[in-house]
Amino acid sequence: MPPLASWLGKPYPPLCGVFTDIDDTLTTDGAITPDALQALADLKAAGLSVVAITGRPVGWSEPFAAQWPVDAIVAENGAVALRRAAEYLNEIGLHRLSNKRWQLSKSYQQAPAIRQQNYARMQQVLAQIESEVPGARRATDSAGRETDIAIDHSEFTHLPQDAIDHAVRLMRAAGMNATVSSIHINGWFGDHNKLEGARWIVRELWERELDAEMDRWVYVGDSTNDQLMFQHFEHSVGVANVARFVPQLQHLPRYVTQGERGAGFAEVARAILANR
């Protein structure tokens, strides 16, 4: 992977925004670092759109959607979006959250009946994985999940690769999508994923088609569940700790930072702003 420095100075259309993963891309040891938080603010101050797309649950994401300088957080691998309160509500789309202090709205890609049906099926698969895969335990943030399930492999416990592969096989055998992030194994029913979530949020927020302006967006990530984004974004960047997942990636990021995690994201932001 070429270093990020090789991207500088190349001609490309003016950028309009940045999509970013959260865990181990914005965060370091589970928390966003001051330099990464300032990088988000600097990008927004420069007039760029900023959207975080994560496998984390919507419940976990709520305080960050309210507090971070981002336009939205798309959680649960593209299924749910959180943004500051909108002017309208509808049955499938936006629902005002009960905590008015945060003033957020939540939108879904799936209708309520489908979400309810899928949730029951996912809990059965989750129980099966915990029963059949030695050491497998649901992620500690599972209570905040509405449209997917997650098995912890590197956040508070460690699963060997064969156990990770076993859990993925069980999810896929049940008809679920399955991806592996830097900390969790995520599974869900539906056609959504990070890329579809990005397309969706661009339509929702700006009434534009992402595919028509893909060369004006940057994506920053760190693991195997980012590879669909690495594949489709011309300006895709891996923070340095993506090296851990390179043997498992079919599609690599176009560039890689020197810094890891939040420091790597801050490096990307500086490069973007230096080229404006």
What are these regions (language model features)?
Residues 124-232:
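Conserved acidic, metal-coordinating active-site core of Asp-based
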Residues 8, 13, 33, 195-276:
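Mg2+-dependent phosphoryl-transfer enzymes with acidic/Ser/Thr/Gly-rich catalytic loops
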Residues 68-69, 77, 174, 232-233, ...:
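Short, structured coil segments at secondary-structure junctions
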Residues 20:
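Active-site T/S-Asp motif of two-component receiver
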Residues 68-71, 91-93, 156-157, 197, ...:
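Short, hinge-like loop/turn segments at secondary-structure boundaries
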Residues 31-143:
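Active-site phosphate-binding/coordination module
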